[in-house]
Swiss-Prot record:
GO molecular function, one term: transcription coactivator activity
Family: Belongs to the lipin family.
Domain notes: Contains 1 Asp-Xaa-Asp-Xaa-Thr (DXDXT) motif, a catalytic motif known to be essential for phosphatidate phosphatase activity.
Intervals of motif Nuclear localization signal: 153-158
Enzyme Commission number(s) of this protein: 3.1.3.4
Keywords: Congenital dyserythropoietic anemia, Cytoplasm, Disease variant, Endoplasmic reticulum, Fatty acid metabolism, Hereditary hemolytic anemia, Hydrolase, Lipid metabolism, Membrane, Nucleus, Phosphoprotein, Transcription, Transcription regulation
Gene responsible for this protein: LPIN2
Annotated source species: Homo sapiens (Human)
InterPro entries: HAD-like_sf (IPR036412), LIPIN (IPR026058), Lipin_mid (IPR031703), Lipin_N (IPR007651), LNS2 (IPR013209), LNS2/PITP (IPR031315)
UniProt protein name: Phosphatidate phosphatase LPIN2
Enzyme superclass (EC): hydrolase
Length: 896
């Protein structure tokens, strides 16, 4: 009985560890890549399917994936998507190519982009420059954040030295964090769980909010990294931005259900199965056609959906739209004299959420972050159980605005005050360096474990990838159609100015900079609304068509139409008979500027300016044309490399080890290993299934090897080794999920039949999630869907006139169907049953085995000659195919 109890306990422990290893949140994996060298020397490759799991919320600079091939780093990088998928970024071939929203992305951030605007002067909330503080901060940057290859090497040495001592501390920290860091998932505590964060998260938020004080990248692109995500839009509970390690509770939908809504097909990107792309494009919500003008205002009308339950809200989410109201036009003096005129239009949810998101702390101008917003809720203090101070690897793509928590302790109080000013809503002042309560003391493992245990899920960082939105009252455009940066920064609007008078959006001089391009409020509002509601930017094609088709041609507030010299000459003439601008007392306090600070034409009211422009256009109508602002280069996602890019990788024939790694500040480095196989255009491939073909059964073949039990068919390793010795390449194709790549790859390396191992070959798995693959293979029993897509893609890498697949091994009729669809001759399709009986599809009555087929390897799989492209000059007429064809049926009546 003791033996039985010990065995049962061992099985339970092993299964528990196995379950932890296949947790969907940690399912990182990499599917092997096949590169085929063509006859002309060019290259073609299969898609790079790489997935990272449980990385939390990342900022754009931390979404860069480094690649190492055969132990050497290559000058090639990937980017991380919202669902953990990795992809390459390439420029579109056509300048105005229309891209689907799920393919649109931004370029990979590089180190140079973060050093462009270092010399930008800091501005106080009142608008005064502080050169002394700017110089102090630039000095800190020069001494603290600029890193060289030698410093990177030192960090690697320290990291290796620290790695051995940190393992024990990580286990203790994660165990202690589960007791102290409590994340609630009940419906009553949802709001409190999102609002009440520890002092660690508060410090991280403050650090993240202060980063735009130092740097504003000049290159912004109007396309985000968002794709069809299963995460549904919920009403935000807090007005402050989420930190880099913040979790959001999703009680309405479990992890299993949310994962089942994702579909990731071969060669594509993850998509939501709730609403397909076609349904999204064909679905027309109940909205009214809106003609934008200078007097167009935007107001959110609260609908009855707020009172619907969580379940009913999911069903009605598609029909919930924001109504845009166009009020009657009024004079500028009336608008600006009443600061609360626009505030009355804005409902409380809009004030606390939308406006704060428009002026998100990560994307405010320099002066807007001098003090924290007053609406930010004080965060509760949480004592950190871990005193661990790790040295993480710093990615070369993280710009100088990244600062490590250990470095914060060494900052002087004056410099630290620039990063972390006192919050207005916090009761009492907090002393700056608290050695034991700093946010970095808590290990990231504890946060991840708490999320996995409590049912929470780390949000994708589509919200963290919002653009840099800046407001200014500079007004107008120069003759070349662009606004100078100095003029824009001179009249920038701070948070306090906007908070005191939200009616600034009605000011005709308001200019909004998004993606380094300048808009007025009528055009910027839909873009900001899309970012807030859907966490996605409007596609470039939509913005361009909106500018071309919807923009009024006779409006003084649309600044995307080029002013000709004749227009600029007529404007001063028409201004001579006009009244002067209203006095400064009628304007809001935030819009008052020193004398001579603005051009004369910007002091006129909106009605006067529009009338003047309309008169000038009426006198001399000139056909206008859109003016492109900033860079017109767009970028799209890709899973394949071009021939030139593959040539730079310097692959050698056969397997090449590849490692994909991503480094974050708070979670260290996550690595994912795979193999790139370089084959020739005339190679012959043997396809082999895994579950039920190499193993004795489908289900037990995945479980028993993890328990140490050999569940492999006898003689298969020897057979495959003999076939490989004759010059054939092996391809292992299974419908398992990408998250089981490491487990499956380890099993193939583990198989050993009396010293004979399986030949190495690419492992082709389904890129979908674990539960989707399990549902397709076990419940639907249609694994051939994936196999046909995958094998057809591999087949297309070779010459069109060649058939790369020579033979195939499987265990089900589904496998036979898939192999037949990709062109494998049925005389070389073999299936095996759980008893180990091998059956040839052409002669099903003749049963054999792996051992017997090994004796006929030289005949069935003859040695491939290097001078020939196949085993025989005419393989279709060999003695194993042609002479074994059935005798054709002949109608005796026709012979008589």
């Amino acid at each position: 009985m003791n033996y039985v109890g010990q065995l049962a306990g061992q099985v339970i422990v092993t299964v528990k560890e196995l379950y932890k290893g296949i947790n969907q949140a940690t399912l990182s994996g990499c599917i092997d890549v096949i590169v085929v060298q063509q006859q002309d020397g060019s290259y073609q490759c299969s898609p790079f399917h790489v997935r990272f799991g449980k990385l939390g919320v990342l900022r754009s600079k931390e979404k860069v994936i480094d690649i190492e091939i055969n132990g050497s780093a290559v000058d090639l990088h990937m980017k991380l998507g919202d669902n953990g998928e990795a992809f390459f970024v390439e420029e579109t071939e056509e300048e105005y190519e229309k891209l689907p929203a799920y393919l649109a992305t931004s370029p990979i951030p590089t180190e140079d982009q973060f050093f462009k605007d270092i010399d930008t002067p800091l501005v106080k909330s009142g608008g005064d420059e502080t050169p002394s503080q700017s110089s102090d901060i630039s000095h800190v940057l020069e001494t603290e954040t600029i890193f060289t290859p030698s410093s990177v090497k030192k960090k690697k040495r320290r990291r290796k030295k620290y790695k051995q001592d940190s393992k024990k501390e990580e286990q203790a920290a994660s165990a202690a964090a589960e007791d102290t860091c409590d994340v609630g998932v009940s419906s009553d505590d949802d709001k409190g769980a999102q609002a009440a964060r520890g002092s660690s998260n508060a410090s991280l938020k403050e650090e993240e909010c202060k980063e735009p004080l130092l740097f504003h990248s000049g290159d912004h692109y109007p396309l985000s990294d968002g794709d069809w995500s299963p995460l549904e839009t919920t009403y935000p509970q807090t007005a402050c931005p989420k930190s880099d390690s913040e979790l959001e509770v999703k009680p309405a939908e479990s992890l299993l259900r949310s994962e089942s809504h994702m579909e990731w097909t071969w060669g594509g990107f993850p998509e939501s199965t709730k609403v397909s792309k076609r349904e999204r494009s064909d679905h027309h919500p109940r909205t009214a056609t809106i003609t934008p003008s200078e007097n167009t205002h935007f107001r959110v009308i609260p609908s009855e959906d707020n009172l619907i339950s969580e379940v009913e809200k999911d069903a009605s989410m598609e029909d919930t739209v924001c109504t845009i109201v166009k009020p009657k036009p009024r004079a500028l003096g009336t608008q600006m004299s009443d600061p609360t005129s626009v505030a009355e239009l804005l409902e409380p949810p809009l004030e606390s959420t939308q406006i704060s998101s428009m002026l998100d702390a990560d994307h405010l101008p320099n002066a807007a972050l001098a003090e924290a917003p007053s609406e930010s809720k004080p965060a509760a203090k949480v004592d950190s159980p871990s005193k661990k101070k790790g040295v993480h690897k710093r990615s070369q793509h993280q710009g100088p605005d990244d600062i490590y928590l250990d470095d914060l302790k060494g900052l002087e109080p004056e410099v630290a005050a620039l990063y972390f000013p006192k919050s207005e809503s916090e009761p009492g002042s907090r002393q700056w360096p608290e050695s034991d309560t700093l946010s970095g003391s808590q290990s990231p493992q504890s946060v991840g474990s708490a999320a996995a245990d409590s049912g929470t899920e780390c949000l994708s960082d589509s919200a963290m990838d919002l653009p840099d939105v800046t407001l200014s009252l500079c007004g107008g455009l120069s003759e070349n159609g662009e606004i100078s940066k100095e003029k824009f920064m001179e009249h920038i609007i701070t948070y306090h100015e906007f908070a005191e008078n939200p009616g600034l959006i009605d000011n005709p001089n308001l200019v909004i900079r998004i993606y380094n391009r300048y808009y007025n409020w009528a055009l910027a509002a839909p873009m900001i609304l899309s970012l807030q509601v859907f966490q996605k930017s409007l596609p470039k094609a939509t913005v361009e068509s909106w500018v071309k088709d919807k923009m009024p041609k006779k409006s003084g507030r649309w600044w995307f139409w080029r002013k000709r010299e004749s227009m600029t000459k007529q404007l001063p003439e028409s201004k001579e008979g006009k009244s002067e601008a209203p006095p400064a007392s009628d304007l809001p306090s935030s819009s008052k500027e020193p004398a001579g600070a603005r051009p004369a034409e910007n002091d006129s009211s909106s009605d006067e300016g529009s009338q003047e422009l309309e008169e000038s256009i009426t006198v001399d109508p000139i056909p206008t044309e859109p003016l492109s602002h900033g860079s017109t280069t767009s970028y799209k996602k890709s899973l394949r490399l071009s021939s030139d890019q593959i040539a730079k990788l310097k692959l050698h024939d056969g397997p090449n080890d590849v490692v994909f790694s991503i480094t974050t500040q708070y979670q260290g480095t996550c690595r994912c290993a795979g193999t790139i196989y370089l084959w020739n255009w005339n190679d012959k491939i043997i396809i082999s299934d895994i579950d039920g073909t190499i193993t004795k059964s489908d289900a037990l073949g995945q479980i028993l090897p993890q328990l140490g039990k050999d569940w492999t068919h006898q003689g298969i390793a020897k057979l495959y080794h003999s076939i490989n010795e004759n010059g054939y390449k092996f391809l292992y194709c299974s419908a398992r999920a990408i998250g089981m790549a490491d487990m499956t790859r380890g099993y193939l390396h583990w198989v050993n039949d009396k010293g004979t191992i399986l030949p190495r070959g690419p492992l082709m798995l389904s890129p979908s999630s674990l539960f989707s693959a399990f549902h397709r293979e076990v419940i639907e029993k249609k694994p051939e869907k994936f196999k046909i897509e995958c094998l057809n893609d591999i087949k297309n890498l070779f010459a069109p006139s060649k058939q790369p697949f020579y033979a195939a091994f499987g265990n089900r009729p589904n496998d036979v169907y898939a192999y037949t669809q990709v062109g494998v001759p049925d005389c070389r399709i073999f299936t095996v049953n759980p008893k180990g009986e091998l059956i040839q599809e052409r002669t099903k009555g003749n049963k054999s085995s792996y051992h017997r087929l090994s004796e006929l390897v030289e005949h069935v799989f003859p040695l491939l000659s290097k001078e020939q492209n196949s085993a025989f000059p005419c393989p279709e007429f060999s003695s194993f195919c042609y002479w074994r064809d059935p005798i054709p049926e002949v109608d005796l009546d026709d012979l008589s």
